[in-house]
Curated annotation (Swiss-Prot):
Encoding gene (name): Vipr1
Keyword set includes Signal: yes
Source organism per UniProt: Mus musculus (Mouse)
Oligomer and partners: Interacts with ADCYAP1/PACAP; activated by both PACAP27 and PACAP38 neuropeptides. Interacts with VIP; the interaction results in VIPR1 activation.
Disulphide connectivity of cysteines: C37-C209, C50-C72, C63-C105, C86-C122, C216-C286
Family the entry assigns: Belongs to the G-protein coupled receptor 2 family.
Protein's recorded name: Vasoactive intestinal polypeptide receptor 1
Coiled-coil intervals, chain numbering: none
Lineage: Eukaryota, Metazoa, Chordata, Craniata, Vertebrata
Glycosylation sites: N58, N69, N100, N104, N292
GO molecular function, one term: pituitary adenylate cyclase-activating polypeptide receptor activity
Signal peptide start and end residues: 1-30
Length: 459
């Protein structure tokens, strides 16, 4: 005797909709139509495998293999109880430990599910009651509004910063070129978030469960590439500053192309590997969920390595700064070396991405709401902070803007006749690239001291 069951198609549709509403703590992605497709495709794959195995089995005196629309129950002799973990579909939203389901094989067939229906046996009632539907909706709307504002503000400020560093030729130097690539990585990351949201949460009438979801997969791949490139350009910032302070003589042009390869090339290699692996081993849905965690180490591993290297560089830079802040000839106007070290450290922490450590090492079972706020809302403002630190608070940028403002103020709106004599980037004084080249004419110790002063002046 088999327990009554709903028709498979109806069962699966009801389940997908119920889980998307009941398991809100999984994050805003729980409402994604593509994630519902992943659940349906996963269950369909398990169903086909179970039915194929059942057809190959011989008749037994016990209970034969059975598919109950969610779980495949193995062949079992009479009088035995089969205990299984809750289906993986319930664990996709958040790790659920300690919940099991069981059936007893009797002479009449399989018994009813114990300790009750799936939503009770797997603890969905407890999770759904922790936050009612209205509170969940308000929370997710607030999170989406928060990171939309953050990424929009970051995008606008980064575009302005890129324009400033591009238009003024006096600001063209290796250091600012690297800053511009870092800005671009944040711009692409913000753009990728908006594109991914459009692809994942499009409420149109498209058949999201069909194979015509290449655009959604491409959006997720682009998003993952932008995130990894963002980490690696933070690593490049650290490598450049460490080289500037620790190496007496080096070819900035040769090093710069190496930085380009690290910042944009290395992430593309790992993303291509990850894409190929997903196509062959996990090609269902929109690729925006973690089903096989081992595959995600192709992305997570290089990011964690870049964070580790940045942390090591951070310690080395702090050591160099302490040594360079002690000599009395570096600057006697500051109140104390420790105050300047504190200012430099505040600049280096976002530069080296140490703040990413807390995000990368959050445990999987950490409270989803708190993790979501940190990763989405707080992380969305990082581009804005970077633009403030490396452009708007840059002393050279401020001096150039003041000089241009004074020229515009004196000449007036129509006084551009002298523009041919004073082009956009033309200005008196030494450019930042000339400052670096002039360091080769002095001793290595004096060059390191001057380089250090140039970097600290950015604070």
């Amino acid at each position: 005797m088999r327990p009554p069951s709903l028709p498979p198609a109806r069962w699966l549709c009801v389940l997908a909709g119920a889980l998307a509403c009941a398991l809100g703590p999984a994050g805003s992605r729980a409402a994604s139509p593509h994630q519902e497709c992943e659940y349906l495709q996963m269950i369909e794959k398990q169903r086909q495998q179970c039915l194929e195995e059942a057809q190959l089995e011989n008749e037994t005196t016990g209970c034969s293999k059975m598919w109950d629309n969610l779980t495949c129950w193995p062949t079992t002799p009479w009088g035995q109880v089969v205990v299984l973990d809750c289906p993986l579909i319930f664990q996709l939203f958040s790790p659920i430990h300690g919940y099991n389901i069981s059936r007893n094989c009797t002479e009449e067939g399989w018994s009813q599910l114990e300790p009750g229906p799936y939503h009770i046996a797997c603890g969905l009632n407890d999770r759904a009651s922790s936050m009612d539907e209205q509170q969940q909706t308000e929370f997710y709307d607030a999170v989406k509004t928060g990171y939309t504002i953050g990424y929009s503000l970051s995008l606008a400020s980064l575009l302005v910063a890129m324009a400033i560093l591009s238009l003024f030729r006096k600001l063209h130097c290796t250091r600012n070129y690297i800053h511009m690539h870092l800005f671009m990585s944040f711009i692409l990351r913000a753009t990728a978030v908006f594109i991914k949201d459009m692809a994942l949460f499009n409420n149109g009438e498209t058949d999201h469960c069909s194979e015509a979801s290449v655009s959604c997969k491409a959006a997720v791949v682009f998003f993952q590439y932008c995130v990894m490139a963002n980490f690696f350009w933070l690593l490049v910032e650290g490598l450049y500053l460490h080289t500037l302070l620790a190496v007496s003589f080096f070819s900035e042009r040769k090093y710069f192309w190496g930085y380009i390869l690290i910042g944009w090339g290395v992430p593309s290699v790992f993303i291509m590997i990850w894409t190929i692996v997903r196509i062959h081993f996990e090609d269902f849905g929109c690729w925006d969920t973690i089903i096989n965690s081992s595959l995600w180490w192709i992305i997570k591993g290089p990011i964690l390595i870049s964070i580790l290297v940045n942390f090591i560089l951070f310690i080395c830079i702090i050591r160099i700064l302490v040594q360079k802040l002690r000599p009395p000839d570096i600057g006697k106007n500051d109140s104390s070396p420790y105050s300047r070290l504190a200012k430099s450290t505040l600049l280096l922490i976002p530069l080296f991405g140490v703040h990413y450590v807390m995000f990368a090492f959050f445990p999987d079972n950490f409270k989803a709401q708190v993790k979501m706020v940190f990763e989405l809302v707080v992380g969305s403002f990082q581009g804005f902070v970077v633009a403030i630190l490396y452009c708007f608070l840059n002393g050279e940028v401020q001096a150039e803007l003041r000089r241009k403002w004074r020229r515009w103020h004196l000449q007036g709106v129509l006084g551009w006749s002298s523009k041919s004599q004073h082009p956009w980037g033309g200005s008196n004084g030494v450019s930042c690239s000339t400052q670096v080249s002039m360091l080769t004419r002095v001793s290595p110790s004096a060059r390191r001291s001057s380089s250090f002063q140039a970097e600290v002046s950015l604070v």
